[in-house]
């Protein structure tokens, strides 16, 4: 009795679809390149030289995902900006230490490869890399039958940057009297989405048709995470930045203490900046208390920067010049060991 000859495609893995995707994304990858990148797509490893301007370079690396914002993007069939989120979550963590992002790699996993969806996602990743000034040097597209529900996929990002050793920003220079400058967020960025999805569920709204503050709810809830690399690197160049905090999971209470010495605390005036409308909606619809809002969401603030009072005017003018909305939201004060590191009043 003759047996049917099985192929990898019969098992659910379409190598031709993967090759088609590679061809589709080549032009997007090409527009992210940097002079330091050696070679192109297709190698077993990606090669990148260190920029020659660094005398004592230190590499800084990071990896992240986009959490359950991805679930919402899949459900709402909006795949073109989730890649920006992926890049943002990685590069914003790097620039906090003063690092210039050099290159980025992605991991895209799915049960059955949809070339159109994957190409949209990777185009978004390339868009994010262009915004951050880093090269998309490689990635992995994993088609894994039986591992994901139909239409689902998962993402992870990996980034490497470089900073001059003498210019690493680690918060050690923060002192009482420093001002706290906040850079506006575009919305929830990529944190708190399990709670956001729960609030959407209990509110009973249809996110595909609902409006919020005269804009599409779907557009606002899926607004891509802001990439702060270029404006923050300019701030570092022209002012004496003492610390930078990327407001991600854990919000104000958990992220700000990560960049403060033990002898100080951050005192923040919550009336000093604007909450994005989506945060007001979430708080009202979910009956979320104040502490939980500040622990889960950025509440309109994507980055907080500690710098001397005398540099505030220069910093605000520079940020305005490049189109960034910013506010002075507080200051650094002396603290005892047993005091809270963050006070919001």
From Swiss-Prot:
It is an enzyme of class 6 (ligase). Its EC number is 6.3.3.1. Gene3D superfamilies: PurM-like C-terminal domain (3.90.650.10), PurM-like, N-terminal domain (3.30.1330.10). Pathway: Purine metabolism; IMP biosynthesis via de novo pathway; 5-amino-1-(5-phospho-D-ribosyl)imidazole from N(2)-formyl-N(1)-(5-phospho-D-ribosyl)glycinamide: step 2/2. It comes from the Bacteria. InterPro entries: PurM-like_C_dom, PurM-like_C_sf, PurM-like_N, PurM-like_N_sf, PurM_cligase. Disulfide bonds: none annotated. The keyword Acetylation does not apply. One of its GO terms (molecular function) is phosphoribosylamine-glycine ligase activity. GO terms for cellular component: cytosol. It catalyses: 2-formamido-N(1)-(5-O-phospho-beta-D-ribosyl)acetamidine + ATP = 5-amino-1-(5-phospho-beta-D-ribosyl)imidazole + ADP + phosphate + H(+). Its main location: cytoplasm. It is found in: Cytoplasm. Keywords: ATP-binding, Cytoplasm, Ligase, Nucleotide-binding, Purine biosynthesis. The keyword Calcium does not apply. SUPFAM superfamilies: PurM C-terminal domain-like, PurM N-terminal domain-like. GO terms for biological process: 'de novo' IMP biosynthetic process; adenine biosynthetic process. HAMAP family: AIRS. Belongs to the AIR synthase family. PANTHER family: TRIFUNCTIONAL PURINE BIOSYNTHETIC PROTEIN ADENOSINE-3, TRIFUNCTIONAL PURINE BIOSYNTHETIC PROTEIN ADENOSINE-3-RELATED. This is Phosphoribosylformylglycinamidine cyclo-ligase. It comes from Histophilus somni (strain 2336).
């Amino acid at each position: 009795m003759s047996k049917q000859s099985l192929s990898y495609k019969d098992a659910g893995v379409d190598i031709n679809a993967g090759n088609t995707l590679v061809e589709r994304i080549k032009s997007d990858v090409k527009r992210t390149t940097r002079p330091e990148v050696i070679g192109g797509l297709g190698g077993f490893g990606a090669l990148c030289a260190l920029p020659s301007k660094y005398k004592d370079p230190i590499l800084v690396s990071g990896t992240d995902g986009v959490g359950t914002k991805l679930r919402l993007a899949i459900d709402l069939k909006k795949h073109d900006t989730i890649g920006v989120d992926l890049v943002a979550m990685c590069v914003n963590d790097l620039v906090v230490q003063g690092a210039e992002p050099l290159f980025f790699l992605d991991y895209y996993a799915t049960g059955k490869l949809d070339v159109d969806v994957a190409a949209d996602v990777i185009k978004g990743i390339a868009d994010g890399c262009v915004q951050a000034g880093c090269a998309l040097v490689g990635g992995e597209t994993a088609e894994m039958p039986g591992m994901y529900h139909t239409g689902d996929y998962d993402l992870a990002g990996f980034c490497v940057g470089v900073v001059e050793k003498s210019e690493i920003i680690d918060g050690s220079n923060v002192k009482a009297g420093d001002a706290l400058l906040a850079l506006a967020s575009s919305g929830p960025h990529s944190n708190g989405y399990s709670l956001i999805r729960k609030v959407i569920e209990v509110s009973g709204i249809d996110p595909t048709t609902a409006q919020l503050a005269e804009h599409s709810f779907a557009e606002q809830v899926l607004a891509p995470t802001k990439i702060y690399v270029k404006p923050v690197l300019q701030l570092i160049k022209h002012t004496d930045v003492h610390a930078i905090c990327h407001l991600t999971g854990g919000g104000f209470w958990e992220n700000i203490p990560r960049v403060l010495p033990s002898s100080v605390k951050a005192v923040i005036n919550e009336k000093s900046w604007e909450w994005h409308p989506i945060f007001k909606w979430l708080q009202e619809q979910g009956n979320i208390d104040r502490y939980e809002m500040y622990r889960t969401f950025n509440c309109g603030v994507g980055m907080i920067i500690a710098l001397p009072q005398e540099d505030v005017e220069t910093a605000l003018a520079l940020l305005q010049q490049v189109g960034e909305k910013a506010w002075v939201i507080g200051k650094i004060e002396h603290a005892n060991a047993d005091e809270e590191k963050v006070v919001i009043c």
